[in-house]
Design a protein with these regions (language model features):
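Bacterial N-terminal signal peptides
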Residues: 26-37
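A glycine-rich, often tryptophan-bearing local segment used as a flexible ligand/cofactor-contacting loop or short
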Residues: 94-181
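Short, Lys/Arg-enriched N-terminal segments with co-localized hydrophobic residues
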Residues: 15-20
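Catalytic beta-strand/loop cores that center a nucleophilic Ser/Cys/Thr
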Residues: 55-64, 148-240
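Extracellular ligand-binding/catalytic regions of CAZymes and related secreted enzymes
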Residues: 41-43, 52-53, 208, 218-273
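Helical hinge/lid and interdomain linker segments adjacent to catalytic or ligand-binding clefts
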Residues: 42-125
């Protein structure tokens, strides 16, 4: 019994010799994990096939919100998108099936997918899952009968349809007040907005499913004189555990240099649903 007592007394000082180690180890564990979260919160993935406009956008995101952008082609996408705070897609030409599936899976798994400009366009009709996932149809036929039409080199107005939403309001300075009447409204309203020149407009998107309309467009066709006021220039919708945001503008770097539009894109990136 005496020997056991000696062993116990020898061991006791060992347990108390380094009382400071436990908090140090805890702090080290915390610091090891902290940079990973900060990195994820401050980096976005931009997948594009036209890069000058995205370089302008990346510069805006860095300057305004200290967000770092990784810009890649769809063939060079990381295998795992989940670490990015948002994935922005700016694809004019064909959207490959692997990228299509990756974007959809990212959003449904809890990611924030931001679909820009011509990532909704007639060429994407060939994709099996893209338009059904987005709840978008681009009808064929003449525009006067409701068919989809794109026109570039135009001047158009963009108006705020969601005066209480973070994406359309946070730090956004709308320089104009624009008369606008939505198709489902009996009355014309004056809404805050901005004008884009030498841009591109998409007419007659047909939307289905639940979403919040963010932006409307107002455009006069120079060839026919017809005035269009439509409500699909920006929207946000739930996608599984995540979200999908669409912004129609972005024809060229010039659109992303517009302060109001650049701020709206930045808001979409930092928005926390």
């Amino acid at each position: 019994m005496q020997q056991k007592h000696k062993i116990a007394s020898k061991c006791a000082p060992v347990r108390s010799r380094y009382p400071v180690m436990k908090p140090i180890l805890a702090a080290l564990v915390f610091l090891c994990f902290l940079p990973v979260k900060l990195f994820a919160d401050n980096e976005v993935l931009i997948v594009a096939d036209e890069f000058p406009a995205m370089q302008v956008l990346a510069g805006k995101l860095k300057a305004e919100e200290n967000v770092t952008s990784q810009i890649v082609a769809q063939t060079n996408m990381p295998a795992d998108l989940s670490r990015f705070a948002a994935a922005l897609v700016y694809i004019h030409r064909d959207l490959g099936e692997p990228a299509e599936k990756a974007f959809i899976a990212y959003a449904k798994s809890g990611g924030k997918l931001i679909v820009l400009h011509h990532t909704i366009s007639s060429g994407k009709r060939r994709n099996k899952e893209w338009f059904p996932f987005l709840g978008v149809t681009l009808p064929e036929g003449d525009v006067s009968q409701g068919g989809y039409q794109w026109t570039e080199g135009v001047t158009l107005d963009i108006v705020n349809l969601a005066p209480n939403h973070f994406i359309t309001t946070n730090k956004v300075n709308y320089p104009a007040q624009i008369a606008f009447q939505a198709a489902d409204s009996a009355a014309e309203k004056t809404l805050p907005g901005f004008t884009l020149t030498n841009s591109e407009v998409y007419i007659n998107h047909v939307l289905s499913g639940t979403r919040t309309l963010l932006l409307g467009l107002k455009y006069t066709d120079a060839r026919t004189g017809k005035l269009y006021m439509q409500s699909h220039a920006g929207w946000v919708m739930p996608s599984g555990k995540g979200w999908t945001i669409y912004l129609m503008s972005g024809h060229s770097a010039r659109d992303f240099e517009n302060p109001a539009f650049a701020r709206i894109v930045a808001n979409a990136v930092i928005w926390k649903p």
